[in-house]
Amino acid sequence: MPWQLDRRRFLRSAMGPLLPLPFLNLMERKASGAAADGPPIRFMTLFKPNGVHPPSWSINGGTEFDFRMSPLMQPFAKHKQDLLILDNMGDFGFSSHANSTRRFLSGHHRNTKSASVDQLIADRIGKGTSYRSLELTTEGLFPNQIGCSYISYDSNGDPIPRESDPQLIFDRIFRSPMRNPSKRREMKSVLDRVSEDAKSLSRTAGAEDRQTLDQYLSVVRSTEKRLESIAAASNDIPKATMERPLAPANLNEQVESMLDLISLALWTDSTRCVTYMLGNSNSRMIFDFLGVKEQHHYLSHFFRNFSRQNLDALLKISLWHMEKFDYLLTRMKSYRDHEGSLLDHSVVLYGSGMGHSDNHTATRIPIILAGQGGGLLKTGRYVRYAENQQLGRLHLALLKMFDADHDSFAYSTSPLPGLNDSDFTPYREQPFQSWVKTGDGTITVQGRLRLSDNLDEARIFLIDVQGQPPIRIDVAFRDFHDFNLAYHCGTPVKITGSVTEKNGQPVITKVQKLDSLFGKKPGSANG
């Protein structure tokens, strides 16, 4: 059947097609009763560098449908019903920055000869769009560990170049075929050049389409002006002051501009697959616009570099990352797309490559899925799996969600359950006895291990023992690392160590032995 308006319709200028359009009701089929094509499902990935401070990220207690958002999740608490928060993701004791970056979309750090999951999804959904996929970043290459700079890989396992300049992305989407930056000054606003066609289209459109078109043109105009302001501000900065790795004062503007462009590109069906790195996995950026004076990577090692000032600075950066995630979701929810919003017809993956940022623990990796995926995701849930899950299982589930024909991915042969139903095995702590036994200068404690949530003592671990105050663990970095205390947090353990007394309470100052009551020890599979 013919269409009233082709889905690939562009607003035209004297030079020809120029500006892609979002979905309009005019694009539905003419014949009454004819089935219209369903909305395309998009895939978007937002990568957060340098892991997290677990007590600020992790959800404590709660159930699948009844849970409280953690402190770091508060910026997007209003999106709770659009989120699927996954816990117990990742099954490695430790991980390097480079390996954790590779694993984020490739499932395993040894999966070096095949495409990352985003590219396999792009193969499935990207045909017929102007851009099969977009690979974007905030930070330049880190040459000392080049693998820290990439999450997207082609079919040969080679990294795909990223673009960091939102102005260039704007030109690709809205100023094609005039993509030469040197020509920008000679060009009118893209909206000025398509104004006559826009007026003509508006006259034939219904009320809802006119509202969508007005919103779209307004967003394009504001994005264009924002990019002009960024460019003007950049031209005013003396080159001698631009010393890497300082983040530019307008980084927030640049990132929000890129998120605007991502939303527009998805909304206009210019692409259906985007990856965006908020920084390299070992990001050295200094967020001076937040009042932070140290490198992000240095601050992420909050155990060995502990001070309350450093931890507060780290949490400022992590909170900023979450605010940008909130910004993206808010944008996507505001754009009408068929019978719903752009977010309703998208799957957005947010996360990092490692859990505990200091110890590089590759368990309890922060992973959130957002959007309904056209009904493919069941959101408003917190899913904590009974056992640690390989990221490859998540990727395989995503591939099947997008009808990509894969029986395995990155050493995983079964898809992760629980993404669109409650058919998964949730974490339930087995019953155990907690107790304390003391000897000559030693103590053995059995109980649940956790990190202190008091930010003034972020180096302190606690073992909860029924009927008495928790036993404190205050040890040097060597014990923290060698016994991988971060790996065991949230689970029952038995610890023997040297003990001293402080303020009338026992404090373990050196760990001699650690046994997990129910889980496996880390270290046999490091990556």
What is the predicted role of each segment?
Residues D456-V475:
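OB-fold (S1/OB) nucleic-acid-binding surfaces
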Residues A525-G527:
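Short, solvent-exposed mixed-charge patches
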